[in-house]
Every structure is written in C-alpha cells, then in structure tokens.
Amino acid sequence: MNGSIRKMMRVTCGMLLMVMSGVSQAAELHLESRGGSGTQLRDGAKVATGRIICREAHTGFHVWMNERQVDGRAERYVVQSKDGRHELRVRTGGDGWSPVKGEGGKGVSRPGQEEQVFFDVMADGNQDIAPGEYRFSVGGACVVPQE
C-alpha cells in the first residue's frame, strides 16, 4: 500500500436521525467527511461538513458532538483515534452558529426558520495528527418555541 495513503487521516462520520423526546419534531443530520492527506491540520481546517434538516415549524437549530468537551467549552471537543492512542481537537460552528451558553451547555445553536442549514467540524488549533481512524458522532435537534 502506498505510504501517502497510509498517512491519510480518515474521519468516519455517521448519519444520524435524532428525535426529540416528547415532541414530534425530528431533526435529520447528514455529515460528510472532508478527510485529508498528510498529518498537519491548520486551525480552522474543515474536518467534516454537516447539514441539519428540520421539516416542521421551528425557531432554530442545535448541534453537538458526543465526545469529551475541552475545558467545559460548549463547542470544543477531543476525538480519540480508534486505537485510543491519539487525539484530534475539533470545534463545531460555521456562519451564524454560536456556542450554547450556560453551565452544562453542549454544542452550538443558530436561530432560523430555514428548512436546512450547514455546520462545520473544524480543527481546533494547529495540530500534528497521527495517521489513523478518528470516529465521532454528532447529534442535533430542532428548536421549537416553548408553549
């Protein structure tokens, strides 16, 4: 196998369908890996791009990762390599997204009534990444008005 192929960082992302409990409002999530060749990631480099779709009435979107948060920061995470020996620091965000505020907040949110919006998973700081497979999962919800 070619050495440069072995050095490629693979990020495995799953597509998830999250349903908010007690509400008929469902959020569809689609995630596409941006992969990469080489072992250096610059701060802000896109690791994956996602799309959240809310087909029913809503006032915003909420996206989070199911990974270890960095220093309690809502939008920053550490992803372990499949073998558990290496780490990749990432953050979620993009145009119009803001970290969820408050203690215990997780992820980013964005106001809006569009049917779908895009978000990014980006490198958090300049990093030298060990070759390997880095898996992570992303969750999402449609924000509905309180009655």
Curated annotation (Swiss-Prot):
Q: Please report the name of this protein according to its UniProt entry.
A: Protein AfaD
Q: Where is the signal peptide, in residue numbers?
A: 1-26
Q: What keywords does the record list, in alphabetical order?
A: Plasmid, Signal
Give the top-rank taxon of the lineage listed in the UniProt record for this protein. Answer: Bacteria
The protein's matches in Gene3D superfamilies, at most eight in alphabetical order, are given as: Dr adhesin
Region Disordered: list its residue ranges: 91-111
Task: Give the family per the record.
Answer: To E.coli AggB.
Q: Does the keyword NAD apply?
A: no
Against InterPro entries, the record matches this protein to: Adhesion_dom_sf, AfaD, Dr_adhesin_sf
Offer one Pfam family short name for this entry.
AfaD
**Gene name per UniProt:** afaD
